[in-house]
């Protein structure tokens, strides 16, 4: 189960990345991620999202990892935009709770396993560049 959720998180992230190119709506990334995750009988956490990277570490735009029904209202990708794609995928439901003890630790509401993967993406003239790709990931 743990390996499955890790693979679904990674594979959904990569499918989202492969969608990146100038001229598409940002929401199209979330749609492809969410569709894949649901096809694997998993869910995408809705309380957290990817984000823009620039002068401030976490900035707009928010990168939603599911179809929120507002794709046409989402930003259109342009060369030079930099953001993260980082789906959090659960084996159970999408709801999460934050610890009352430390105010930081997050668990799934139904206590199911969860996994997250993340890359930082640069929109190029013809597609994308993965800025955080490690050498050992090149052949995966």
Place the predicted regions along the sequence by residue.
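Active-site neighborhoods and metal-handling regions in enzymes and metal-associated proteins
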Residues: 1-140
């Amino acid at each position: 189960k743990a390996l499955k959720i890790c693979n679904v998180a990674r594979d959904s992230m990569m499918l989202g990345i492969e969608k990146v190119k100038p001229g598409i709506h940002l929401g199209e990334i979330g749609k492809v991620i969410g569709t894949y995750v649901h096809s694997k009988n998993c869910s995408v956490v809705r309380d957290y999202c990817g984000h823009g990277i620039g002068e401030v570490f976490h900035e707009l735009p928010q990168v939603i990892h599911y179809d929120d029904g507002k794709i046409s209202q989402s930003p259109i990708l342009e060369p030079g935009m930099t953001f993260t794609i980082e789906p959090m995928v659960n084996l159970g439901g999408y709801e999460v709770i934050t610890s009352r003890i430390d105010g930081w630790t997050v668990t799934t509401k139904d206590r199911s396993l969860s996994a997250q993967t993340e890359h930082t993406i640069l929109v190029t003239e013809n597609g994308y560049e993965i800025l955080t790709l490690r050498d050992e990931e090149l052949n995966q």
